[in-house]
């Protein structure tokens, strides 16, 4: 905490913490979600295991806050205080309809979490070591109630921005199919690496049909392209996390260097074309997930007869095309037109 903290360092630490916390909490569901559902149907006594995924998804705020504290080299008490405030403000835990208990509702609002985590971090930096002897009894309640309370109060406002953005995107649904799918794929490729939740936008505009399919393909293109671009400079686990978990792990990096989205946007546009040509479908509930948990491919296959041909088509459009176009555009912008460098994709996590 004695190091000089610049605005850039502060912003990057907060965004990196939110990004890493999001991915860590979503990866269990992405890898095991469908498997645990299947196990629960075969062995009802093990159905409770699916609850672990629901809880993990709801803990993004807590995990992100603690990770942000680690990035700032805070003490455990300070880090957990940020986590508690961020979890409370994010809205993933809400009262039951009869107000007698609590229930989990999704993963919470990422924008609200960023705001609250930044506020809580600034609060702890302001206090510094003044409360050192009483930190255990002062910091957690003050940060949770005051900072978390402010964050929770702003939750409806930040959630409303998602709806406003959704209303703007909704106008695209009246365009010609190929133009529609290209734009939707590119927009969702951007949304998934932004503080805005792509799933929330998809639900807000009730996106379905080929528009939903294009949204998922855009996210697939984003995940695979970022993994390919960072293959030489990041660990293999981090690369895989981009499409198995969420591309949001690169959110802070993209905010710092927006130009690294060039290959992603081009790859998403190509995938969007194939969404229209091959009639790739989806639903409002599936749009926004992409390849994570195989939600996108499974949602499309649910609209087909499930034949071997349809399975092959899904594999081509959800994996082969994003990977091939990702390789092409990464090489284009790093070798042929050297606008970006592989080092630009390095994540310091």
Q: What are these language model-derived features?
A:
Residues 1-349:
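Pore-lining transmembrane helices
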């Amino acid at each position: 905490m004695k190091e000089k903290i610049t605005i850039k360092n502060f912003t990057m630490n907060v965004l990196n913490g939110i990004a890493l916390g999001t991915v860590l909490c979503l990866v269990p569901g992405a890898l095991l979600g469908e498997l645990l559902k299947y196990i629960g149907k075969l062995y009802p006594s093990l159905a409770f295991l699916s609850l672990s995924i629901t809880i993990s998804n709801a803990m993004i705020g807590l995990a992100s806050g603690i990770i942000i504290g680690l990035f700032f080299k805070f003490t455990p008490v300070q880090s957990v205080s940020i986590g508690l405030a961020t979890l409370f403000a994010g809205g993933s835990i809400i009262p039951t309809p009869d107000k007698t208990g609590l229930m989990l509702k999704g993963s919470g609002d990422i924008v609200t979490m960023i705001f609250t985590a930044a506020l809580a971090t600034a609060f702890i930096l302001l206090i510094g070591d003044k409360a050192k002897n009483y930190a255990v009894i002062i910091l957690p309640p003050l940060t949770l109630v005051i900072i978390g309370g402010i964050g929770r109060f702003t939750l409806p406002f930040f959630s409303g921005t998602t709806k406003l953005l959704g209303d703007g995107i909704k106008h695209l649904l009246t365009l010609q199919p190929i133009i529609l799918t290209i734009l939707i794929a590119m927009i969702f490729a951007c949304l998934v690496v932004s503080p805005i939740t792509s799933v929330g936008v998809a639900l807000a505009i009730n996106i379905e049909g080929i528009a939903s399919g294009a949204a998922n393909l855009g996210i697939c293109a984003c995940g695979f392209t970022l993994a390919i671009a960072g293959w030489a400079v990041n660990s293999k686990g981090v690369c895989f996390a981009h499409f198995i978990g969420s591309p949001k792990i690169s959110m802070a990096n993209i905010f710092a260097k927006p130009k690294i989205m060039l290959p992603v946007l081009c790859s998403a546009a190509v995938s969007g074309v194939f969404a229209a040509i091959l009639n790739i479908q989806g639903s409002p509930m599936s749009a926004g997930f992409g390849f994570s948990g195989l939600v996108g491919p499974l949602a499309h296959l649910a609209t087909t007869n499930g034949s071997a041909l349809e399975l092959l088509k899904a594999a081509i459009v959800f994996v082969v095309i994003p990977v091939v176009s990702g390789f092409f555009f990464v090489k284009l912008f790093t070798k042929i037109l050297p606008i970006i460098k592989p080092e630009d994709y390095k994540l310091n996590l």
